[in-house]
Each structure stands twice: as structure tokens, then as C-alpha cells.
């Protein structure tokens, strides 16, 4: 399949390159040029008044929690989890996770998200939803190491990895998913690390999300979560660490030296009053930071444009520094950094020879005028509804705001029905 995107503006680094033509051959960006003279074009997309940029990457979410959107709001994390969310999650079925995942994927594709990282359960059903939709994902079975048989818990994660890692021509990747230090003691984590090394897998976990978590771990082990993880050897494998809100300067050095990828979830952290991660210091020390929404029950959406704008504004206010997290850095966090953290190679930028993972944003709208700085407009003015076209591995998932791979009406109906059936269950 050879697709030509004509007369499109392209985001390359921190600049908009105007009026180019992008030739996509199968799943690769074959050529970017001024010419339209190509042999055998199967499909043409009009790029006029649009910006092509890398697809957005949600580095941390719990997709099937779309079913709990709006169910429990305005509560602290511990109460929200223990009294509201966990009792409902205990009722979930595999079908619930499948339809909840599809609902989230519809929302993400509509907003220009082309890849995400998720930790949950019934992950075979989520993987099926990913396979059907055409989106990319790094998936992890959430593992709790303090309840039941530790070996059985670990084996579920390992079995899932064997079945799905690099499936769908590499669109689906798998990490092992020990939930957090407060649910996974060092003895269990050591087993997870050994398996990750044996299978050449990364690890996805939650770290230092709240002040209470940090204090509890210090009381239990005499170390902060990040120092504890460093001691047990977690950072000897590629790690995606979600949150990292309460970290000190020495811990930031550890994250940098060990190459830990951090999923910054600014909106969820604010909504749950968890705090604000020291992103400025992380970036200064070379920590690779991506952006995430967290679950749609704690955000309450999967809109990466909101996270992009928030990361570029929140830290300016917190640091009292107007140049902290400039527009260019916010976009890199949401694209290139995210793909690298998830382990997808040759993606995250628009370049010849790279994967055709890109979106087209319609900038022929009042909030993009006057066009003094379109890079700035993408961060401070754009929204999900501006995304016109989504292409993943050279496959069109959405064009002119129409989803091509999913039955959106059916998915919304099924998800709504299941969400309210869950609430009715005793």
C-alpha cells in the first residue's frame, strides 16, 4: 500500500516545514519531498491546512477503567482505591475489560494517540482489543505480590508475555508489571527481575506516587521507594516508572544514571491531590520523561492534548520560570520520548525510513490564527477535536474524524451497559 499525503506542513524537531509531500509505503515513511511525481499511488490524502506530526503516546494508563469514569471523584488516592475502585474492580469480567478497553481506544484514536502503556488484569482481552483496533501498546499484567501464591501471580505475567510480546507485527509489546513497592515486597520483586532478565523484558511499575506511600515504605524498609528499588536491582532492566512525584535530588540522579523512563501524569496527580513531580529537575538531569493520563477514572479522560498543555504550563507556575518546559519539550515528551520509553524503535519522529506513525491536525480553525507560531499553537491552543487523521504502521485508523477500524456506536453501547451492570452487582 502506497499512500501520498499531499501539500502538508510537517513538524520536524521544533520547526514547521511547509508544503511537503509524504510518501508512505506499507508501514514506512518512504520519502518526504517537494515533488508529487511518484509511481503508483494507491491512496491520496489532502494535507492542505494540516500539520503532520508524530502520533501521541500515553505512557501510563489503565484503559478498562473507562467503565468507572465519574464513579468516584474528589477523594484522596488511598480512599479512592481502597473504598471505591478496588471493590468494583473485583467484579470485573474479561468481557468488561474488553469493551472498556475498546471504549478507551476509540477515545485515544480520536485524540491522536497512536500508542499507550497499560497495566491491568484480563490483559488477554485488552490485547485482543489492541489487535483489532490497529493501535500500538505496551501491556503488562498487574501483579500483586502480597496476596495469594506469588508464583502463580508471576506466572500469569510471564504467560501473557509469551503469548503477546511482539505480536501483531510488533504492534504489541509486553512488560512485566509488579504494581508498586507497597504491594510487591523485595522477595517478589527479585523473582520478577530475574524473569525480566531471562525474557529480555522491561518492567512497568508505580513509584513514589504519594507522600503517604513514601513514608510507609520508609517505615517498612528504611528506604524510600526509589532507593529500595535500586537496592533490589529493579533498575538493572529497562523500567517504566509511573508518577515519581515525591523524589529528591539524589533519587533523580539514580533515575538518570539507570536510564529509567518516567511516566509523568500531571492531571491525575493534581485531581487526586498527590502532588507535582519535579519535572524540571528531571529534565535537567537527563531523565527521559514521557506523559500519561493515568486511568480514566482518575483523570477523567484520555486526552493527551490536555496533558501536553498542562505539563507546559503547570511547571512554569510551580517553578516560577516562564521558560520551564517550553512547547518543543512538551511535544517531545508526548511523542519521541514516549515511544522510546515503551520500546518502539524507529518511531516517534517524522523521518524517512521511520515507521509511518503520524497524525494530521487540522489548523484551519479560528484558534490557530494568526499563525505566528504553529508549534506553540499545537501546545497551547490545540485540542483532540482538531485531529483529522491518524495513521499507525501505515494503516489509516481515522480519516476526516471517522474511525476506520472500530464500530464506535456499538462500543459505546456495550461499555455503558456493562458499567451500570457492575454498579448493580452486590
From Swiss-Prot:
Binding-site positions, substrate: 89, 179, 209, 294
Against InterPro entries, the record matches this protein to:
Amidohydro-rel, Deaminase_MtaD/DadD, Metal-dep_hydrolase_composite, Metal_Hydrolase, MTA/SAH_deaminase
Catalyzed reaction equations? S-adenosyl-L-homocysteine + H2O + H(+) = S-inosyl-L-homocysteine + NH4(+); S-methyl-5'-thioadenosine + H2O + H(+) = S-methyl-5'-thioinosine + NH4(+)
Pfam families reported in the protein's UniProt record: Amidohydro_1
Its required cofactor(s), as named, are: Zn(2+)
Entry keyword rRNA processing: no
- Provide the GO MF annotations for this entry: 5'-methylthioadenosine deaminase activity; metal ion binding; S-adenosylhomocysteine deaminase activity
Q: What is its EC number?
A: 3.5.4.28, 3.5.4.31
How cofactor binds (record note)?
A: Binds 1 zinc ion per subunit.
| Residues that bind Zn(2+) | 60, 62, 206, 294
Alphabetical keyword list: Hydrolase, Metal-binding, Zinc
Is-annotated flag, keyword Hydrolase? yes
Matches recorded under CDD domains: ATZ_TRZ_like
Question: Which PANTHER family is this protein grouped with?
Answer: AMIDOHYDROLASE-RELATED DOMAIN-CONTAINING PROTEIN (PTHR43794:SF11), AMINOHYDROLASE SSNA-RELATED (PTHR43794)
**What is the similarity comment for this entry?**
Belongs to the metallo-dependent hydrolases superfamily. MTA/SAH deaminase family.
Q: What does this protein do?
A: Catalyzes the deamination of 5-methylthioadenosine and S-adenosyl-L-homocysteine into 5-methylthioinosine and S-inosyl-L-homocysteine, respectively. Is also able to deaminate adenosine.
Annotated protein name in UniProt: 5-methylthioadenosine/S-adenosylhomocysteine deaminase
**Organism (species):** Dictyoglomus thermophilum (strain ATCC 35947 / DSM 3960 / H-6-12)
Query: Gene behind this chain?
Result: mtaD
Amino acid at each position: 500500500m502506497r499512500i501520498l499525503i499531499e501539500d502538508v506542513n510537517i513538524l520536524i524537531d521544533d520547526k514547521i516545514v511547509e508544503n511537503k509531500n509524504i510518501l508512505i509505503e506499507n508501514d514506512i515513511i518512504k520519502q518526504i519531498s517537494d515533488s508529487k511525481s511518484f509511481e503508483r499511488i494507491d491512496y491520496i490524502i489532502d494535507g492542505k491546512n494540516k500539520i503532520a506530526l508524530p502520533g501521541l503516546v500515553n505512557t501510563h494508563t489503565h484503559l478498562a477503567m473507562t467503565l468507572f469514569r465519574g464513579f468516584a471523584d474528589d477523594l484522596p488516592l488511598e480512599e479512592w482505591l481502597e473504598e471505591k475502585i478496588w471493590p468494583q474492580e473485583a467484579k470485573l469480567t474479561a468481557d468488561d475489560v474488553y469493551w472498556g478497553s475498546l471504549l478507551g481506544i476509540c477515545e485515544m484514536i480520536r485524540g491522536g494517540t497512536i500508542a499507550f502503556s497499560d497495566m491491568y488484569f484480563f490483559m488477554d482481552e485488552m490485547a485482543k482489543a489492541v489487535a483489532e483496533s490497529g493501535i500500538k501498546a505496551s501491556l503488562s499484567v498487574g501483579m500483586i505480590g502480597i496476596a495469594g501464591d506469588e508464583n502463580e501471580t508471576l506466572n500469569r505475567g510471564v504467560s501473557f508475555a509469551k503469548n503477546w510480546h511482539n505480536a501483531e507485527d510488533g504492534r504489541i509489546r509486553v512488560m512485566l508489571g509488579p504494581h508498586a513497592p507497597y504491594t510487591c515486597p523485595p522477595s517478589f520483586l527479585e523473582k520478577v527481575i530475574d524473569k525480566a532478565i531471562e525474557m529480555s523484558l522491561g518492567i512497568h511499575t508505580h513509584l513514589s506516587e504519594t507522600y503517604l506511600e513514601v513514608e510507609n515504605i520508609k517505615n517498612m524498609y528504611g528506604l524510600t521507594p526509589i532507593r529500595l528499588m535500586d537496592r533490589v536491582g529493579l533498575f538493572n532492566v529497562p523500567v517504566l516508572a509511573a508518577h515519581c512525584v515525591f523524589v529528591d535530588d539524589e533519587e533523580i540522579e539514580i533515575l538518570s544514571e539507570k536510564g529509567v523512563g518516567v511516566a509523568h501524569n500531571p492531571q491525575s496527580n493534581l485531581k487526586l491531590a498527590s502532588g507535582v513531580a519535579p519535572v524540571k529537575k528531571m529534565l535537567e538531569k537527563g531523565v527521559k520523561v514521557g506523559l500519561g493520563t493515568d486511568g480514566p477514572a482518575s483523570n477523567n479522560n484520555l486526552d493527551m492534548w490536555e496533558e501536553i498543555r498542562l505539563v507546559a504550563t503547570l511547571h512554569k507556575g510551580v517553578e516560577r520560570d516562564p521558560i520551564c518546559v517550553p512547547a518543543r519539550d512538551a511535544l517531545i515528551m508526548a511523542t519521541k520520548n514516549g515511544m522510546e520509553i515503551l520500546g518502539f524503535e524507529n518511531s516517534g519522529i517524522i523521518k524517512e525510513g521511520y515507521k509511518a506513525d503520524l497524525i494530521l491536525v487540522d489548523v484551519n480553525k479560528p484558534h490557530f490564527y494568526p499563525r505566528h507560531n504553529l508549534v506553540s499553537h499545537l501546545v497551547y491552543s490545540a485540542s483532540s477535536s482538531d485531529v483529522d487523521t491518524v495513521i499507525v504502521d501505515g494503516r489509516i485508523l481515522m480519516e476526516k474524524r471517522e474511525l476506520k477500524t472500530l464500530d464506535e456506536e456499538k462500543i459505546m453501547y456495550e461499555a455503558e451497559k456493562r458499567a451500570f451492570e457492575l454498579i448493580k452487582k452486590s
